């Protein structure tokens, strides 16, 4: 069937590869197939419910009939609570007028791009990374892609940024990072900030400045000795050029509650508000009122995070240990030690091997298909995050992982690996 003539954007836009893969896996599970599904960056609410206090506040908020339109910038009491929350937990000073509320991170990221990036403007981002390629495409930006490697925890280096920074409009950094679960070091972040400040000092009064979109949606979920650093704490002058993306989606396992916030210069926040007022991507009034109260419950938040982080970290470390054990047995797999978020970065480098049935795994797509069919293991290749098609690394998300199934999953993976020649 021929497709109707639509806009250039509609004709060239690629849907989320992660959602597409996840939907295909979910369909197989619904049809009765046993699959260890580590594809979607979400949580099983039966394993990871939202905080009980937040749930009660949301229910009460609906009973209080908080169901009218919220203010376009977000209700004032929530913006005040966010201001207090980030001051208490991260040491950041942002007034309510420097805070924009929306229905999660996506509309905030989109409006950052729309507020800053013109057609042809250079957008710098590393790959693998989440959706920067799509947002750059939707705004007509010039893609300046940094291919990141395991040697640097799949994060951009100072040299990567330095050689591309001239003429750039936006740099996108996510730390802790989706999809890798790795973080940007203090020294690297500080040096990148220095490059941005130096570049902006060289631009004229009428020139567009270079901005940093800093996605820290996972910043509370760090493990072991890992520490999260942010640009404004490291270089206070960066406040003029930084837009933070944050929210409750991952920190409170509240992906479906849809409350996110951006922090940034009031002039940019005002334009994001104007864009969102036309898009209408507001967080629901009842949830905003509930989150405003919950963010002030310091003890409840600390207790929830203690449980939550222990459970996530246990899953990440258990699977990491399993992959390292397989590597030590001589199999072509590897894993990056868990640092943060809900993701484990694993390597499954089987291209060129032959299956027991005599089929050659000639591409990484063949490898992905093989481990799904033989080991019943579903993971997302880094190619879904903008990396090259031959990249042998994968994102493994543990938000729906049943701990007791991990040994069984690893056993099936080893059996599948053992069949290859």
Predicted segments with their positions:
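N-terminal small-domain helix-loop-helix segment of the aminotransferase-like
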Residues: 2-7, 11-104, 111, 295-297, ...
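Generic structural signal for small/hydrophobic residues in well-ordered secondary structure
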Residues: 21, 38, 58, 82, ...
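Conserved core segment of the aminotransferase class I/II
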Residues: 55-56, 81, 234-313, 317-328, ...
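Conserved core of the PLP fold type I
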Residues: 60-207, 219-236, 362-363, 411, ...
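PLP-dependent enzyme catalytic core of the Aspartate aminotransferase-like
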Residues: 84, 360-361, 370-379, 385-421
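Hydrophobic residues in well-ordered beta-strands that form the structural core
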Residues: 125, 145, 173, 212-214, ...
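Short, surface-exposed loop/helix-turn segments at secondary-structure junctions
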Residues: 276, 353-365
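Conserved glycine-rich beta-strand-loop-beta hairpin in the small C-terminal domain of fold type I
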Residues: 292, 306-320, 332-355
């Amino acid at each position: 069937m021929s497709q109707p003539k639509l806009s250039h954007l509609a004709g060239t836009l690629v849907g989320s590869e992660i959602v597409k893969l996840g939907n295909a896996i979910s369909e197989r599970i619904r049809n009765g197939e046993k699959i260890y599904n580590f594809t979607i960056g979400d949580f099983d609410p039966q394993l990871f419910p939202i905080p009980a206090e937040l749930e009660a506040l949301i229910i009460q908020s609906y009973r209080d009939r908080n169901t009218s339109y919220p203010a376009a910038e977000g209700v004032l009491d929530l913006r005040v609570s966010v201001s207090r929350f980030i001051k208490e937990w991260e040491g950041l000073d942002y007034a309510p007028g420097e805070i924009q509320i929306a229905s999660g991170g996506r509309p905030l990221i989109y409006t950052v791009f729309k507020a800053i990036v013109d057609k042809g403007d250079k957008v710098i981002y590393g790959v693998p990374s989440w959706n920067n390629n799509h947002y750059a495409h939707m705004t007509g930006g010039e893609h300046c892609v940094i291919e990141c490697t395991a040697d640097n925890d799949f994060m951009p280096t100072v040299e990567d940024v330095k050689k591309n920074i001239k003429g750039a409009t936006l740099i996108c950094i996510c730390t802790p990072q989706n999809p890798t679960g790795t973080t940007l070091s203090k020294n690297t972040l500080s040096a990148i900030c220095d490059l941005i400040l130096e570049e902006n000092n060289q631009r004229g009064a009428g020139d567009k400045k270079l901005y940093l979109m800093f996605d820290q949606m996972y910043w509370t979920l760090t493990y072991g000795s890992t520490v999260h650093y942010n640009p404004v704490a490291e270089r206070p002058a960066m406040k003029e050029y930084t837009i933070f993306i944050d929210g409750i989606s991952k920190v409170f396992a509240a992906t479906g509650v849809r409350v996110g916030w951006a922090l940034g210069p009031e002039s940019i926040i005002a334009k994001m508000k104007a864009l969102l007022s036309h898009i209408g991507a507001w967080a629901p009034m009842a949830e905003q009122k509930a989150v405003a109260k919950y963010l002030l419950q310091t003890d409840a938040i600390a207790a929830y995070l203690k449980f939550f982080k222990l459970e996530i970290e246990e899953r990440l470390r258990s699977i990491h240990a399993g992959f390292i054990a397989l590597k030590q047995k001589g199999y072509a797999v590897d894993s990056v030690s868990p640092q943060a978020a809900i993701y484990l970065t694993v390597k499954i480098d089987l291209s060129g091997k032959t299956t027991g049935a005599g089929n050659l795994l000639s591409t990484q797509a063949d490898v992905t298909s093989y481990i799904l069919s033989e080991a019943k293991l579903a993971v997302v290749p880094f190619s879904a995050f903008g990396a090259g098609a031959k990249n042998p690394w994968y994102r493994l998300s543990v938000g729906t992982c049943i701990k007791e199934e991990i040994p069984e999953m690893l056993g099936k993976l080893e059996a599948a690996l053992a069949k290859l020649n």
